[in-house]
Amino acid sequence: MPRLALRQYNFYYRVNGEKAEELLKEYGEDGDFLLRYSESNPQNFSISVRVAEDKILHIKVTKYESDMLSIFEDERTTPNQFGSITELAEFYMEFPEKLREKNGLFLELKKPVYVPYHLEACAEEQRRTQLYRWWHGNLPASSANKLLQTEKNGTYLLRASQHIPGALVISAKTEGQVVHLTIYQDPSTGRFNIDGDRTKFQSAWLLIDSYSKNPIVEKGEASRVLYLEEPLFNTFIEADLFVDRFEIIRRPINPRESMEKTGISEEFDRLSQEALPAEQYLSKREGRRPVNAEKNRYKNIVPFDHTRVILTDRPNTPGSDYINASYVRFENSQRTKNVTFACEKSFIATQGCLETTISDFWSMVWQENSRVIVMPTMENERKEKCARYWPAEVNKPEVHGDISLTCTIERKVQRAVSDEVKAELEQEKTNRIAKGLVPEAELNGDGISYILRTLVMKKGKDTREIRQLQYLTWPDHGCPLHPYAVLNFLEDVDREYDYFNAQPIAASLPQGPIVVHCSAGIGRTGTVLVLDALLNQVKKVGLLCPMDVYKMVKYVRTYRSGLVQTEQQYQFLYKALAFYLKNNNPYPVKSFIDGDTDAFDFPRRLRPTPNASRPSSARQVTSSRPSSSASSRTSHSRPRTGPQAEPIFERSTSSTSSSSTLLKSTKK
């Protein structure tokens, strides 16, 4: 499993040594660790690591005059020095042989201990910040610079300091440059302040809110004005906070203007806008060739050339190797350098069969050695969605090309529904009916969730077994009322997939991709495979699993255009994941927001007014130099220089209701 990314809010805690031992014994496993400030010297740090169930070791981390960090006290003889505590911890996680106890035994740092914020105040304090949509986690300064350079002046984000545990950084664009303001957290009180400003705030939100109403002014000849106007939203969230994030982004952004515009719709709109330019550079030539036109159910939905499934063992005639199907791979490679998958898996996303493509479909299944087929559609929903490509009767074989196919078992599956889910389902039905939306498939259905078929394929002397799972209650328009049945369905899909992986033949003939299709092969198909992939990440990693629905959908669309076709399907992904995480959390679920999402919305923005006057009084704060040099310190042993001279900024303290609070526009 890929190493967990270290993130400031899940490995640093504002605790003493005694509390650190308590946390590691209660919640940790051998090799788990946390970082804290040293009690004897506030300039230094300590890494507390659990060695055994009843043994906790504390490793002293010394900060030299050069600002470099090391576990060795003598700066002149130490072999490894680090520019940040994050680099230090990552180094010893990657190279455990470099760290030994006094008795000579290796001391292994495996992963940061997970402390549930539901139960521990020190964890709640650190985790609360992550709920902000403008929080960008462990983003380095160089990446913040890259993100903000293309944004307008006044755009800002909040991130974790790479060098100071517990500290945050405001990265903001002003006059075409990016500046970084460090927000320090007092280790004794937990309050926040910007360097140079004596005002301390109880939370990062209150600090940002204050500075968004009062601009920051550079002290000196340049006199640049820094406005915190427009937050740059991030879509990343960790699994244990996903439920609260869903509650925040499902609400209207501005109810007075529109009840339809939510954080989710905003994400989906941005996703659609970003997809259009990218697709101009990806070829779909093969699917658009006249010879292949009749093989496409919808003429405008064809695969990319670089990810299409190419049928082999075909005659050398134009179009003979074509099928409207695309690979979608959740695998770690150079292609996925910005995405890490803890659970690697592959799919084939394809359209519902036409009568003329059934033979091609089964040739593909055989060629790829796919053993599981997922069909989230009926054959007909007002019109044909998919031609029946499996035998109509049990134990009566059909022949498609050189493949003989027999359905040996057909079983209807119905899952029991809890009273809680029934109540939620009835409420959702009532809400939709009130809006004139009648979910016929679920409202009037017979309660059958899906059909499981066992199919036997024969080609020559070879025989293979296939499982097909056909989901029956996905409504023709929209999405299921409740994710409960879909989640159970996907559990059974994974069970069948694991069954085939466990067979002895899998060692010599590995199981191929799961085949998923609806009608067009993009809407329900995309929703199912993205949901399955994200659920498997959570099951593998746990509550610290990074969740990013936006980036996952963006990623799969590089394999097949339009996967997750509608905003409703995109919202259903959030809804299903939130339901799963809420009902599979081993700790008591505690909401940060308690229905008050405004507390986690971005602060009111200060709009610059032309020709406004400079305030008479201001507070001084400091910012780092607006360049990426400070963020490039990645070597583990190369010497580093001390901090550079930093420009001074002022903060206006006048009332925001008066134009005099706004500073004069600076000369270019």
UniProtKB/Swiss-Prot annotation:
Enzymatic reactions: O-phospho-L-tyrosyl-[protein] + H2O = L-tyrosyl-[protein] + phosphate
EC number: 3.1.3.48
Deletion consequences: RNAi-mediated knockdown causes an increase in ectopic formation of membrane extensions from body wall muscles and a reduction in life span caused by early stage mortality. Prevents constitutive dauer formation in a daf-2 e1370 mutant background.
Pfam families: SH2 (PF00017), Y_phosphatase (PF00102)
Positions of the catalytic residues: C518
Domain SH2: 10-113, 134-232
GO MF annotation list: non-membrane spanning protein tyrosine phosphatase activity; phosphotyrosine residue binding
Coarse class of the protein's main subcellular location: cytoplasm
Stored InterPro entries: Non-rcpt_Tyr_Phosphatase, Prot-tyrosine_phosphatase-like, PTP_cat, SH2, SH2_dom_sf, Tyr_Pase_AS, Tyr_Pase_cat, Tyr_Pase_dom
Tissue distribution: Expressed in embryonic cells, developing vulva, body wall muscles, head neurons and gonadal sheath cells.
Function according to Swiss-Prot or TrEMBL: Involved in embryonic and larval development. Plays a role in oogenesis by regulating mpk-1 phosphorylation and oocyte maturation in response to major sperm protein (MSP). During the formation of neuromuscular junctions at the larval stage, negatively regulates membrane protrusion from body wall muscles probably downstream of receptor egl-15. Plays a role in fluid homeostasis probably downstream of receptor egl-15 and adapter soc-1. Promotes vulva induction and negatively regulates fertility probably downstream of receptor let-23.
Annotated protein name in UniProt: Tyrosine-protein phosphatase non-receptor type ptp-2
Species this protein is from: Caenorhabditis elegans
Lineage summary: Eukaryota, Metazoa, Ecdysozoa, Nematoda, Chromadorea
